[in-house]
Regions:
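N-terminal cap/lid segment of alpha/beta-hydrolase-fold proteins
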Residues: 36-70
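Short, surface-exposed "cap/lid" segments of acyl-processing enzymes
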Residues: 69-109
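Alpha/beta-hydrolase active-site loop
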Residues: 129-152
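Alpha/beta-hydrolase fold nucleophile elbow
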Residues: 152-166
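Alpha/beta-hydrolase-fold enzymes
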Residues: 163-248
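Short beta-strand/loop motif that positions the catalytic acidic residue
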Residues: 269, 275-277
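Conserved alpha/beta-hydrolase "acid-adjacent" motif
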Residues: 278, 282-290
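Catalytic histidine-centered segment of alpha/beta-hydrolase-like enzymes
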Residues: 310-321
Length: 338
């Protein structure tokens, strides 16, 4: 009898193990799906654009989102000169996060960080062809594709915010003033109040000898960083891994539009605008923030913010999140995003 009792106990344990295994197998797809919904993803998305010469070119984009990109506001990120899309997705260094794209994806946005014409993995036509007009025409076509659904994702975004940095801000202003593609515009590290820029004329003359050229590391460090508010390891990483090339066409057209409101079409921009200027930006400091709003004569609203403790490359300074959080609040308020 004892032997039969022990045998029954053994069978019961075996059955319980099988039931437990079946339960685990039944729940496994649900667990994987839950993990997948919480996963931050980055997808390569290429756009075909046609420029003034009638030829097709490729603009490389990188889509950041968490779970799904559907039913989310889209931020289209436009990097500045001598950068590519990686400006928006610098890594964590010494425990500090420097990725604007990943920060905003965690906040519920979809973000398309593009490599502008002539930079990163986008097409590289002749350097003199890559001008303000051609660059902005390519950005316009990317925005139109994302709005219409005629894009590699096959999805039409209902709310689009155009976000620029430095030269990318000039291009974004021109696009919005010409085509009005976005629902809102965020301009960082770029102002319109005339002042002297700390760029030696001899440097410009030297760079203009080449159709594509890098900015020297010493110049990038001095112009883009407020050393007291940045990690030296990040500055070194920037020069080694984030730096890209500029074109002579951009030098003579985009740079020439810096303090020319008619050239960048700031007065033709409609819709809401947020401008962020850094206190220690050696190129466009917040010292001139008080006069900035006057240039946006047709914008439905203009908010100008001064950010302390940052230099020109906002994202790669230690206090980057002050500006990021403010952009997030402004977009949510402006577009009524939940």
């Amino acid at each position: 009898m004892k032997r039969g009792y022990l045998h029954s106990i053994g069978r019961l344990r075996h059955v319980l193990r099988l039931c437990a295994l079946a339960l685990v197998l039944a729940l496994t797809p649900v667990i994987i799906k839950a993990d997948d919904d919480n996963l931050l993803k980055v997808d390569r998305v290429d756009f075909s654009v046609t420029l003034s010469d009638g030829n097709a070119y490729t603009i490389a984009g990188f889509l950041y989102y968490k779970g799904s990109f559907r039913n989310r506001p889209l931020q289209v990120l436009v990097h500045g000169g001598s950068y590519n899309h990686k400006y928006w997705d610098a890594p964590t260094i010494n425990g500090q996060s420097y990725s604007y794209a990943r920060f905003m994806a965690e906040e519920g946005y979809a973000l398309l960080a593009i490599d502008q014409l002539g930079a990163g993995e986008s097409s590289k036509p002749a350097g003199d062809f890559v001008t303000l007009n051609e660059t902005t025409l390519s950005i316009h076509q990317v925005l139109a594709q994302m709005r219409s659904g005629n894009n590699p994702l096959g999805y039409a975004f209902q709310q689009i915010v155009l976000v620029g940095h430095s030269f990318g801000s000039i291009n974004s202003i021109f696009v919005q003033g010409t085509f009005h593609d976005a629902d809102a515009l965020v301009v960082t590290a770029l102002g319109h109040v005339p002042h002297e820029l700390p760029i030696p004329p001899e440097l410009i003359i030297a760079l203009a000898q080449f159709p594509y050229f890098p900015l020297p590391a010493e110049a990038r460090s001095a112009l883009f960083y407020f050393a007291d508010a940045a990690d030296a390891d990040v500055i070194a990483y920037d020069n080694l891994n984030l730096a890209d090339l500029l074109t002579r066409g951009q030098l003579f057209t985009t740079f020439a539009a810096v303090f020319n409101p008619a050239a960048d079409r700031v007065g033709a921009v409609t819709g809401p605008v947020l401008v962020q200027l850094g206190e220690h930006d050696s190129l466009w400091p917040s010292l001139y923030a008080g006069g900035e709003a006057a240039f946006w004569t047709n914008a439905s609203s203009v908010t100008v913010e001064s950010l302390p403790i940052v230099g020109h490359a906002f994202n790669t300074h230690l206090d980057n999140k002050t500006g990021w959080k403010s952009i997030n609040r402004w977009i949510r308020s402006t577009l009524a995003v939940n």
